[in-house]
Each structure stands twice: as C-alpha cells, then as structure tokens.
Amino acid sequence: VEETPVGSITNGVHGATWVSAEVDGVLSSTVGDDWQWADHDAWQAITHVDGDALWQAHAASKVRMVDHVRDRLRHHGLAQGRSASELEWVDTALDPSALTICFARRMATYKRAALLLSQPERLRALLGDDDRPIQFIFAGKAHPADDHGKELIRQIVTFSHDPAVRHRFVFVEDYDMALA
C-alpha cells in the first residue's frame, strides 16, 4: 500500500464529459481553465467558489435538461403515432425548480430501479405534493437477454403513463450519451 498510493478510484468517470457547460464555466473561473487536470492544490480554490454563480449554473443546467427531456418525450410520442394534442401535457412536464431524481443506467434487477413502485399510492402522494415538489426521470436499457430488466422497464413505463403522475414521473426512451 505504501509503495502504490491510490488517491482516488473513479470507476472510469471522465469529469469533462459529464459536467454541464454551465458548471464547466464556474469551475474554469474558480479552479482554472484546465480544472480537469488540476492538482489537489489548485482544487483548493473551490472553497472560494461563488455560491450564487454555482447555483445559477446548476439551475440553468436543469432548465436545459428539462427542455431536452420534453423534446425527447414529444419526439417519441409523435413517433408512436400520438397526436400533438395528445402530447400537450409534455409542455408542462417536469418543473426545473422541483427536486429531481434521475435514474439513468442499465436496467438490471439488482439496481432496484422499480423499488419506488412497490408502494404506488405513497409514490403518487409524493408526486402530487405541490408544497414539496419532487419528480423522477428514468432512462435506460436492459440487456437483450435480460427479461427481468425488460420487465422493470415495462413497470416503470406503465406507471409513467398514468395521467395523474406523468408530468412528474417520466421514462425517456433511447437512452444515450446526449441524454446522459
């Protein structure tokens, strides 16, 4: 251990790929334009980050994400033969100011994607609470040979089609890096 020190394990995450353009701007102005490669000492500048600027970057990223998800929902609805009037709800789906929980990954049973659905009435109550708005965005694919993973997706999609919750509980098809 002393001979091979390990500073961190990232599981292959490449920060510059996944950080939004807005947050990238804050990091560049705080840590430096090369924040992706900055050393520990350079990262100490993050303790002086402008909290308002960081929050504004987060909020702008979230608005962009909501717009992108709405576009995806509309596109897939039209591709499935739904009319524009049937998809009017998409214009108000998701609220950029609500607590947003995203689950976007490979759908496998051990990841417990459908755990929320084990108490559907409780989930409906949470989704309907306008005083404490919360919303969920699901996306992902199952391995072609994983029937259980496909069943998880079916359960999530079925719940997301409920008109009472579809504005706060969505499944986005064709998960890819653009959506991620």
What are these language model-derived features?
Residues 1-180:
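Catalytic cores of carbohydrate-active enzymes across secretory and cytosolic contexts
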